[in-house]
Design a protein with these regions (language model features):
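Rossmann-like NAD(P) dinucleotide-binding subdomain of oxidoreductase/dehydrogenase enzymes
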Residues: 121-201
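Terminal low-complexity tails and localization/encapsulation signals of metabolic enzymes
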Residues: 1-34, 65-72, 120-146
Length: 201
């Protein structure tokens, strides 16, 4: 099981919020307990994310260069499907077969958005008369992703991958009923080399 620390601004730390107890739904046994994020933890994560996202090294990164990070995350999920499946089963009570499918789906989501970045073509309407036609792609900045308890890793991927692909930073708030697989995903995202501060749980 993950050690129950939060991932804020690229660092693992104990949250200063309320205690969260992760329970295995099949028998009611306790997986672990951890402390959630307090308001101050969240405000600090927001500040770090905004700072990281505004850095030219991320904000101005070419789409195909951002794709490398998404592929690395997809590879990390695939390499750890058994562990992710076990954690998600303990967290949600789903079968190992189902959680393996969800983990594989999450990997596919990151891979899809990576491929999209490498193959995106500008869709421009035909220029008329003396007009100027252009497409401008700008990140929004910071995306807050709130995901449900029942399919955490697949839901996480569906929010995180497009946000990172567009050049944003992401703050993930998983359900307090099933936070463990999201923390495991944070380890994979950290090992992908994604610049510090762009992702927090």
């Amino acid at each position: 099981m993950p050690d129950g620390k939060l991932f804020i601004g690229g660092e693992w730390e104990t949250g200063t919020g309320e205690e969260i107890v992760s329970i295995f739904p099949a028998d009611g046994s306790i997986n672990c307990s951890l402390y959630g994020a307090s308001k101050n933890d969240v405000l600090r994560a927001v500040k770090l994310a905004k700072s990281a996202q505004s850095q030219p090294s991320w904000r101005s990164l070419k789409p195909h260069e951002r794709a490398r990070y998404l592929y690395a995350i997809a590879d990390g999920i695939e390499a750890n499907i058994d562990r992710i499946s076990q954690i998600q089963t303990r967290d949600t009570g789903k079968t190992l077969r189902e959680t393996a499918i969800l983990a594989s789906s999450a990997s596919g989501t990151f891979r899809y958005f990576g491929a999209l970045l490498e193959s995106s073509d500008d869709l421009l309407t035909a220029q008329r008369n003396d007009s100027l036609t252009m497409s401008v792609y700008e990140p929004l900045g910071l995306v807050s992703a709130i995901t449900p308890w029942n399919s955490p890793i697949a839901s996480d991927a569906q929010k995180i991958a497009p946000a990172l692909a567009a050049g944003n930073a992401v703050l993930l708030k998983p359900s307090s009923w099933s936070p463990l697989v999201s923390l495991e995903l944070a380890k994979i995202i950290e090992s992908s080399g994604l610049p510090k501060g762009l992702f927090s749980v």
